[in-house]
Regions:
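Mature catalytic domains of secreted/periplasmic carbohydrate-active enzymes
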Residues: 1-121
Length: 121
């Protein structure tokens, strides 16, 4: 992670791996921000990480004060499927349900870990 300019107040953070764990909230005076995708690639549906793996990573990043943004794929089918005779325009912009499920789990796990940490102080 790096700060690209003195004007940046957070790191851009684009990555395709879960290898980077911040040492703390700040990287060269900028908020540590990590941005990766849940699907097989940017803007793709599905989940490429096991629930436990991505949840543990999110907890490690946020525990150090870092920020994690998880990019999701939206359904992009549109128009009329003449083979099926149905209108598929209702799926445009809908987040993949499997990614929604995984995001909810990650949020729950991060909140639970933060509450446990607060309780143990």
């Amino acid at each position: 992670m790096m700060r690209f300019s003195a004007q940046d107040d957070y790191t851009a953070g684009e990555t395709d791996s879960l290898l980077y764990i911040p040492e703390g909230r700040w990287v060269d005076g900028a908020q540590c921000h990590i941005w990766t995708f849940l699907g097989e690639f940017w803007s793709q549906p599905g989940t490429r990480f096991d629930d436990r793996v991505i949840s543990e990573y999110a907890k490690k990043v946020t525990d150090k004060g870092g920020v994690l943004t998880l990019e999701v794929g939206t359904m992009a089918r549109s128009g009329r499927d003449t083979r099926a005779g149905s209108d598929t325009s209702a799926t445009i912009g809908i987040i993949d349900p499997e990614q929604v499920r995984q995001l909810k789990l990650i949020i729950w796990e991060v909140r639970r870990a933060a509450q446990q940490k607060t309780k143990n102080k």
